[in-house]
Amino acid sequence: MSGRAIGTETEWWVPGRVEIDDVAPVVSCGVYPAKAVVGEVVPVSAAVWREGHEAVAATLVVRYLGVRYPHLTDRPRARVLPTPSEPQQRVKPLLIPMTSGQEPFVFHGQFTPDRVGLWTFRVDGWGDPIHTWRHGLIAKLDAGQGETELSNDLLVGAVLLERAATGVPRGLRDPLLAAAAALRTPGDPVTRTALALTPEIEELLADYPLRDLVTRGEQFGVWVDRPLARFGAWYEMFPRSTGGWDDDGNPVHGTFATAAAELPRIAGMGFDVVYLPPIHPIGKVHRKGRNNSPTAAPTDVGSPWAIGSDEGGHDTVHPSLGTIDDFDDFVSAARDLGMEVALDLALQCAPDHPWAREHRQWFTELPDGTIAYAENPPKKYQDIYPLNFDNDPEGLYDEVLRVVQHWVNHGVKFFRVDNPHTKPPNFWAWLIAQVKTVDPDVLFLSEAFTPPARQYGLAKLGFTQSYSYFTWRTTKWELTEFGNQIAELADYRRPNLFVNTPDILHAVLQHNGPGMFAIRAVLAATMSPAWGMYCGYELFEHRAVREGSEEYLDSEKYELRPRDFASALDQGRSLQPFITRLNIIRRLHPAFQQLRTIHFHHVDNDALLAYSKFDPATGDCVLVVVTLNAFGPEEATLWLDMAALGMEDYDRFWVRDEITGEEYQWGQANYIRIDPARAVAHIINMPAVPYESRNTLLRRR
């Protein structure tokens, strides 16, 4: 049996009698748990082999351990904060037979977790002596060998079947014992082996196999979140911009009450999460003016990310927005409409934040006695003090945890974390574990536009979702590579595809008209289960502060931006109906909840992109064909990879476009014409993928 040999410094894995290798999903050699959500089909694979011609088989062993989140690190130089201790839920493990794939000695299985918490799995390898015996016996019978030559083989088979019978319930043993008796009865080998080779015996042994040399594989973890961790549509809004205008046409500062009045419109578009930038008091020292001016006018509202003033810090709401009770009412109103509120967690301070007065050790002090402000040379951000996590980690860790738990207690279960790559990685591992141990339903979105090593590393450390480079992927080859990467990293990274943010107005939206807004929405909403947009996208807001910049003109980060959504909708200047339809289609099709099953199909036109998805649980299948040209029609031949759809090359079938309602009869090759003046994409309801094909297509390669 394989096991772990513990040395003085290094742990080595000792090979077993049956070798088990290349197990997946395993993240960083098992250091971190893989990710899944309740109801997600999790594919597992492993290489299982032994010497010679002896048959091997594999069993997937799955166990639910409970809701306690795995702690990857302790708080430095201090006790770990006490958390509620609940006894582990003892659940009988699931034993799932694995099947061999196209590659020899590679076995596949899958399981579907049904509750939030930590699940474990391992792959057990074992010798299959009856399969070995049957295979050899059939070959010898086919070669015409007689009773004398097969005497030992027949007796060996009888012994194996008798052994197997001891592991079968008494009421089901008779066929095995009868087959063993026949093998021991002198006579023609074909007659003696007839019972042993029947499908009835084969099916019985599939349920109750005789296992030799059982080797237990290493155990690995899968953390299972609630479904919103994978599938959801996000809408970002500034509550302060919802106050409308006064009689003179000047913007009025919004409140949680005026923001709540916008919630029915947002829910009506099909969004699941309303994300709020920081709602805390804004610093008054070195406050930024409009369009990021270093000098603020007396009426300028400042940037919400410059958190803290004499009015409070991270655990306080801005007095112009209302009270904490008003915030609670806003959260309740969103919940009543079927939405959640996500809150920005920006761990930085304005110079007049209470922390800067009371805890100078949480910042970096310069030789002249001043606190260092944020810089990205040559840029300077005098209105922001970055935190220093090394001077007093115990105190700062505890305070951030207190802040997060404060907002959890007020109904926030999703945090969008600002620039987590600028904070220590062990801090995030500690914080996420502490929070999720108390409430496993709390989720974290990482806003880290940083190189892959850090972006993916944050996902491994526990971040539920991640921002991505989708915004900058605009060509066919870039989008294809990006989509394939979504599937490749699905074991630990869930991208949330935002089409825009208050910081990012990509050039394709600045210069390609309303059609490109629809195109990017289709791509984001259908390539990933999680997608989002920042308020104003539905109004085609596209003016940059200057040519070559991705900053919005009159950026809402620095001023109030009320909008008249109703008038735009009445005048046909709104993408709202199309976004609503997109989110309806997403909810209709479980295929859009999948990360692993995206598959690209060939279109002989670089301005057209085609990809499909299927749901391994139901077989639901969709195919998206989207144009990348916002100004004119594009046509081409679409060549479907029929095997990837569970079909034969000669199949013909009817499909329905979920955007237009039109129906077509399709086959392997199909003429496509997309005119953005009519619709920027086909979203095709395809025939369901057959059950057998689903299992095969979900296998890891």
UniProtKB/Swiss-Prot annotation:
Pathway: Glycan biosynthesis; glycogen biosynthesis. InterPro entries: GlgE, GLGE_C, GlgE_dom_N/S, Glyco_hydro_13_cat_dom, Glyco_hydro_b, Glycoside_hydrolase_SF, Ig-like_fold. One of its GO terms (molecular function) is hydrolase activity, hydrolyzing O-glycosyl compounds. The gene is glgE. Keywords: Carbohydrate metabolism, Glycogen biosynthesis, Glycogen metabolism, Glycosyltransferase, Transferase. This is Alpha-1,4-glucan:maltose-1-phosphate maltosyltransferase. Alpha-maltose 1-phosphate binds at K288, Q348, D383, N419, K557, Y558. Homodimer. It catalyses: alpha-maltose 1-phosphate + [(1->4)-alpha-D-glucosyl](n) = [(1->4)-alpha-D-glucosyl](n+2) + phosphate. Residues 286-317 are annotated as: Disordered. PANTHER family: ALPHA-1,4-GLUCAN:MALTOSE-1-PHOSPHATE MALTOSYLTRANSFERASE, GLYCOSYL HYDROLASE FAMILY 13 CATALYTIC DOMAIN-CONTAINING PROTEIN. Essential maltosyltransferase that uses maltose 1-phosphate (M1P) as the sugar donor to elongate linear or branched alpha-(1->4)-glucans. Maltooligosaccharides with a degree of polymerization (DP) superior or equal to 4 are efficient acceptors, with DP5 being optimal in the GlgE-catalyzed polymerization with M1P. Is specific for the alpha-anomer of M1P as substrate, since the beta-anomer of M1P gives no activity. Exhibits an alpha-retaining catalytic mechanism. Is also able to catalyze the reverse reaction in vitro, releasing M1P from glycogen in the presence of inorganic phosphate. It comes from Mycobacterium tuberculosis (strain CDC 1551 / Oshkosh). HAMAP family: GlgE. GO terms for biological process: alpha-glucan biosynthetic process; glycogen biosynthetic process. The record marks D503 as: Transition state stabilizer. The lineage of its organism: Bacteria, Bacillati, Actinomycetota, Actinomycetes, Mycobacteriales. Belongs to the glycosyl hydrolase 13 family. GlgE subfamily. The active site is at D418, E447.
